[in-house]
Amino acid sequence: MKWSNKDGYPWSKIIHAEKFFDKVIQNDTRPGKWEWADVVSGLRDLDKDPRMNSERRYVAIVNEDVGLGETKGIGITPGLFCGCQLIHPGEEVTSHRHNSVALYFIVEGTGELEVEGEVYSYKPFDIMTCPAWSYHAWRATGDKDTLMYVIHDMALLAYMRALFWEEPKGSENIRHMVKGSTHTWSNTKAPEVSKTQAAKELLKQGE
């Protein structure tokens, strides 16, 4: 099929419908299995890194059958992201939001999930959800680590170039999650960091 591209945009093409449908038909995904011990091991490895003491401890569980090109391996199934998160006792993941819907399955630990000002306590084997673009924060209030699975429709939104993230809370931190947009991902506050920040706030109030 001949076509002209006088303006010189090499990524802009016209193709025959048959070729288009060849691209639409993808390979099916194979069944996958991820051992819980391996997931925990990955989280513990992050925990050993001193640079991660105040970072979000998070591993993504991916299927290499999912996605194409640069989006290959961004989901556990087409459209869905799955990860596992570790929060230490006394730590807080401060308020943030994203336009992906989130589902959480608590494996270990106790604490609180705050969504738009409403506080919900959690314990092992609870299932919790957070609507899209809702501010939410986590606090591990128990004496054991919090371990939880997190499932988002993030992979679908990323593929559509429609994923937005605000972290930490503040309109200046809203990011369109595409290349060239700076993202902020590290937002777990260690207890001692929280106290330091609180002291700074008191000093500001006294000025």
Swiss-Prot record:
Residues 85-151 form the Cupin type-2 domain. The keyword Oxidoreductase applies. GO terms for molecular function: dioxygenase activity. It comes from the Bacteria. The keyword tRNA processing does not apply. Dioxygenase that catalyzes the cleavage of the aromatic ring of 5-nitrosalicylate (5NSA) without prior removal of the nitro group in biodegradation of 5-nitroanthranilate. This is 5-nitrosalicylic acid 1,2-dioxygenase. It comes from Bradyrhizobium sp. The gene is naaB.
